[in-house]
Every structure is written in structure tokens, then in C-alpha cells.
Regions:
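Glycine/tyrosine- and acidic-biased, solvent-exposed loop/turn segments at the edges of beta-strands
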Residues: 1-243
Length: 243
């Protein structure tokens, strides 16, 4: 590999270059008395720019552009740094222009809404961060971009209502209440028609009481958990008659 460098007092200074065997530039880096300070670029053997970075006093700084390849395809990643830490809006975009991901940092920590997209450009998952932890709503999506599950977080733990949805109808499939990462309080499950299928109560992340319903809305059974199993208190047929 051929290269060219300039030295001052034994330290690399100015633009440093290396070359591919065909004579084209492979890397270009700017130094200031041995410390990277300026752009850092890398090229393919055909001259195509594959990486464009920036340093200030040896630390990552400013806008970075990376051309990446994977088994899913080629993409471009745009990222920003400040004082060596991720800071600002990041994005990944497929070669056809469709988004792969959007994210943001503040002082090296995750901040704001992060979104990951499928190959077709539909969202797969969106998560809200604050101070590097999940804080706020998180949504996962079906392949058509409609919500599959929505949850709420507080300081990295599930808190509040979590809902799951049916793919075909989009109606609510279940809803649970969480507190400090555990299921706590009332919960409900639904048929794909939207009718109530089951409701009950959770304690310490376990279901302890439930009522089941027929699709026609009639009560089917009432049960409570005892000794690790369910004890049926009442049972009814589909006409509402007690068995």
C-alpha cells in the first residue's frame, strides 16, 4: 500500500493519504501535530466515497456519512457527533431512498423518538427515549404499518396501559396495566369483533381473578387463582344459565 504523509517535529501533520494498488486514493485524513483534526475519508478502489468523517482535537465531531452493505441491502447512515459523543439526529436510508431508521442523541444519550422501518418503508417499531431510557410510548407495527402493540414506559420500565391489536380488524386484542414493569390491576381481552372475551385483575405480574365471556356477551365463568391453579367459582352456558 502506497502512502504519503507530512511530519512536523516527528508528528504527522496535514493531509495523510494511502492508495489502492490501482493508484486511486484509499484514505485521506487530516492531522494536526499527530492528532486527527479535520476530515477522515475512505474510498473504494473505483473512487467511490464510502466514509466521510470529521474529527476535532482527536474526537469525533460534526457530520459523519457512512455507506454500508448488508445481506438486506445497501444503505447510507448519517450521524452527528459533538465532543466525541453522539449528538443530534441520525438516520439510515436504503439505496432506493426509503428510510431504514431515524434516531436522536443528546450528549451521547438516546433522546426523543426512535423509529425503525421495514424494507418497504413501513414502520416496524417506534420508541420514545429520555436520558438514555425508554420514557413514553413504544409501538410495534404489523408489516402493513398498522399498530400491533402499544406500551408506555417510565424510566425504562413498563408503566401504564399496554395494548395489543388484531391484524385483520385492527381492534384491541388485550389491555393490561403495568406498574414498575409488572402487571398490576385490571386487564381485559377481546374477541376480534371487539366484544369482551375476558376481564380480571393482576397482582405482582400474575392474573389472580378473571371473568370469561361468550362471543354473544353472556358470562361464561368466574374464577380465582389459588395455590398455583385456577379455581372456578361459577360457570354458565351460552344462554346465561348457571351450570
Amino acid at each position: 500500500m502506497q502512502s504519503e504523509r507530512t511530519f512536523i517535529d516527528g508528528k504527522v501533520d496535514g493531509v495523510s493519504r494511502t492508495y489502492h494498488s490501482n493508484g486511486k486514493v484509499e484514505t485521506e485524513k487530516v492531522y494536526k501535530l499527530g492528532i486527527e483534526d479535520g476530515y477522515d475519508r475512505r474510498y473504494g478502489s473505483d473512487g467511490t466515497l464510502t466514509l466521510d468523517e470529521c474529527y476535532k482535537d482527536g474526537k469525533r465531531d460534526g457530520k459523519w456519512t457512512q455507506h454500508l452493505s448488508s445481506n438486506l441491502g445497501d444503505m447510507v447512515r448519517i450521524s452527528f457527533y459533538k465532543n466525541g459523543l453522539p449528538d443530534g439526529q441520525w438516520s439510515e436510508t436504503w439505496k432506493d431512498g426509503k428510510p431504514r431508521s431515524k434516531s436522536s442523541y443528546k450528549d451521547g444519550k438516546k433522546e426523543g423518538v426512535w423509529i425503525r422501518y421495514g424494507k418497504g418503508g413501513k414502520p416496524e417499531k417506534s420508541t420514545t427515549y429520555k436520558n438514555d431510557e425508554k420514557n413514553g410510548e413504544e409501538i410495534t407495527y404489523f408489516t402493513d404499518g398498522t399498530p400491533e402493540k402499544s406500551s408506555n414506559y417510565l424510566n425504562g420500565k413498563l408503566n401504564g396501559v399496554t395494548k395489543e391489536f388484531y391484524f385483520e380488524s385492527g381492534k384491541c386484542k388485550s389491555e393490561y396495566t403495568f406498574k414498575n414493569g409488572q402487571r398490576e390491576g385490571a386487564y381485559k381481552r377481546y374477541f376480534d369483533t371487539g366484544e369482551l372475551r375476558e376481564e380480571g385483575c393482576c397482582e405482582a405480574d400474575s392474573e389472580v381473578y378473571r371473568k370469561e365471556y361468550y362471543a354473544n356477551g353472556k358470562l361464561k365463568s368466574v374464577a380465582e387463582r389459588k395455590g398455583g391453579g385456577w379455581n372456578t367459582i361459577e360457570r354458565y352456558d351460552s344462554e346465561g344459565n348457571k351450570e
